[in-house]
Amino acid sequence: MVDNLEGLGPSVWNSIQWIDLWIVFPSIAFLAYYNKFMKLFPARDCRTDLKLLAGSVLLIFMIEAPSYILHKPTEYAHPHGLYRNEIIRAYKQFGFINYWIYEVKYLRGCTTEEKMYATKFMETLKQKKPVTPLIEDHKKNLILILVESLQSWPINLLVDGKEITPCLNSLTKEGDVLYFSKVLPQVKGGRSADAQLLLNTGLLPIETGATASLYATHEYPSLPKALAVHGYTSISFLCDDKAYWNQEATTKSYGFEKLYDHMAKGELMVKADENLFKYSVPILEKEQQPFYAQLVTMSGHDAIKTDFQSQFDNLKLENVLVKYNLIITEYVDRCIGEFIKTLKKDGLYEKSIIVITGDHDAMSYNRYEGREKCELSDRYVPLFILNSPLKTKCDKVIGQSDIYPSLLDIMGADDYYFRGLGESIFRNQSDCAVYHTGENAGRCQEDSIIRKKKEMWKLSDILIRMNYFKSCVER
């Protein structure tokens, strides 16, 4: 795992602040106090130690109890409410002791009631009529580019009259390209790994922790498994090591037959995408068709200073990190453009449906505008579908969980037994997506739709923890 830190140095140093010294300062201060003063006191008996321990526990209880008593677990003022949704902020506000309490409560197996709830819900879904196929079996390849931290707001944005993403901008204007600019990211603690979960299995991330870390070897329904029935081979390309985010295990659980890691070929993280695209093409050219290829990029991981030659080098912004983000986004866009050109040159472009989407938000739009509050609309990531055999309107809000059922439809695998917890963009668009905090984006005002989409988070958490789909395979 240490090897995966290569190239992260600038990012790590950029994240460190003086206030972070408080993490180690109490321990150092206590050791200094102990060495200087505690040895001067005479030895105590066990009763004194027990009294000190009891007093410490009572003091901790008096400090921590009000947050639990005065607030509901769903509120951010309650430790569990904040740890569930914004774990870093929760660490700062409530500390490690509250996190241990939270872990004891939530990192557990499923109760009988939870299992019954999930099983009943899934049985209801199975009783629905089979969906009608939207297209005939076309045997086109599927190439999915999962772009690290790519968001919608830089696309078609001019800064000092200059385009940040000329390649992606041009795609938004092509008639055979579907472009959704309002895709609400629904990742949680697993971030990029959660995005792979959403797109490949149609499930939402677990409530606590990262699915890839805690439940990597569970049984999952998936896009690769659905396509395998139709004769597809599934391949995943990673810039980093397969151990990062436990991707060796999840790749296998999701049904990918081949995995190529270290596609950065020794380049630093911020320059990884160029080699990912360069070295994946020869492999795809030799691969038996039809195939499903997932390419997971890395360059956009952090907004750091680079040596890229950019038209924004002299750009003056109050937040320099936003400038760095624009420069890296410009580079990533250029890499994607070159990859598409290569596919066209080699004859793979016309034989493939190409999907480009961001894995999660990072540099949200409010930071570019200098606003402190981050709205859900500031977090949107894009979705491009090139050579789409199906057409649909693209102006509504969708969630990342809606991509999986949409890909099943577009690839003619709509007969697969699990169609995910979202809705296909080719069948129904409710203009609603629910964030992991329970907030909803979009213009939908129907309580029943919003309530159902919120319920999907609870259902998915239970399905994953109870390993529900293992029983489906065994049957």
Where are these regions (language model features)?
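N-terminal secretory/membrane-targeting segments
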Residues: 1-140, 157-165, 172-173, 217, ...
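Solvent-exposed soluble domains appended to multi-pass membrane proteins
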Residues: 120-475
